[in-house]
Amino acid sequence: MNKRINEVSGRPIGEYLSRDISDFQRVSRTLFECFSSLATGATLNSQQLQQIQLPIDQISNNATPNMVLQLMNHLIDVDKIYQNTLKKLEKHQKIQKEITEIQKEIEEKDKLISTLALNLKDIESFLENELSQDNVNINNGNASDGIVNEVLIDLKQPDDAASMDNIVNREVSPEDLISYAHKISGTTSAPFGYQPNAPLASLFKPPAPQDEMMRSSVLFTKPPPHVLKYYGLAEIDVTTPTMAANISSPFSIGGNVGDVTTPTSKEQEDQQQQQQQQQPQQQLSQSQQSQQQTESELQPIQSILQPPQQLNIDLDLNPDLDSSGDDDDEDDDDEESEEVEWD
């Protein structure tokens, strides 16, 4: 038996399965014949007993109970071998199924590789044709036939003349020049009669902000407390009322040490109501104070943001001539008034 079990290696599983089925069939038939011979007293076939190879010393034509027991044990052994062969067959089927699936995947991959190879071959031929055409165009010097020639010509010979022509032919209106000159005039020249210590007129300003302008700007002004609190810069909330002044001690000590008076529950309720009534008034007063502080702090900012007043700058170079003309006009007016009075 062990030899037969160990033999199941290196040979097809179908041969072992067919052999085990035939052995099981032969032993079971012989066992049933022994049962019939015991029941009827008929003789057995000695050739079948020899084929079974039972460990019997004397093989007789008549069935005995000992022979029946040996046949049953032999049938059990053959059945075990047959069951082991079936298990191996099941494993073989699983492995064969996996092999078939892998073969299908390999076939699909082979098809994909073949299609990719064909596409690669087509692309290669297409690129070869394009390169050959471009080489011909480059050798012939026809820049209009291929894109490569156009790029090379643009890189080798930049069109500087055309760009210069565009710059020269570009028109600029006088209004644009005047407006631009007006914008930069306040920072490029000083006013007539400028003095270094005197403040500048509203139309003129220095090219860079001065110290006074920087000090009066928003960067040098301290923001109000509620703004500091909003950005997390204030350590104490100034808008909340302080309750320390309103809280009274529950014990009042008189002149003597022993005289200690404790307030009743009604008095405590009255004090709490008074404190609750005073809280909104204190909050309103503090909010008004904070608003006044913010307004006072924002006044320099508003003064900066307000547009400067227009100043009439007298740029007359000959004030004496103008004054004499004005005097003549006044004399004429006086003469006319006198004539009217005499009339």
From Swiss-Prot:
InterPro entries: Mediator_Med4. GO terms for molecular function: transcription coregulator activity. Residues 271-316 have a biased composition (Low complexity). GO terms for biological process: regulation of transcription by RNA polymerase II. GO terms for cellular component: core mediator complex; mediator complex. Transmembrane segments: none annotated. Residues 86-125 form a coiled coil. Keywords: Activator, Coiled coil, Nucleus, Transcription, Transcription regulation. Its main location: nucleus. Residues 317-343 have a biased composition (Acidic residues). It is found in: Nucleus. Residues 247-343 are annotated as: Disordered. Component of the Mediator complex, a coactivator involved in the regulated transcription of nearly all RNA polymerase II-dependent genes. Mediator functions as a bridge to convey information from gene-specific regulatory proteins to the basal RNA polymerase II transcription machinery. Mediator is recruited to promoters by direct interactions with regulatory proteins and serves as a scaffold for the assembly of a functional preinitiation complex with RNA polymerase II and the general transcription factors. Belongs to the Mediator complex subunit 4 family. Component of the Mediator complex. This is Putative mediator of RNA polymerase II transcription subunit 4. The gene is med4.
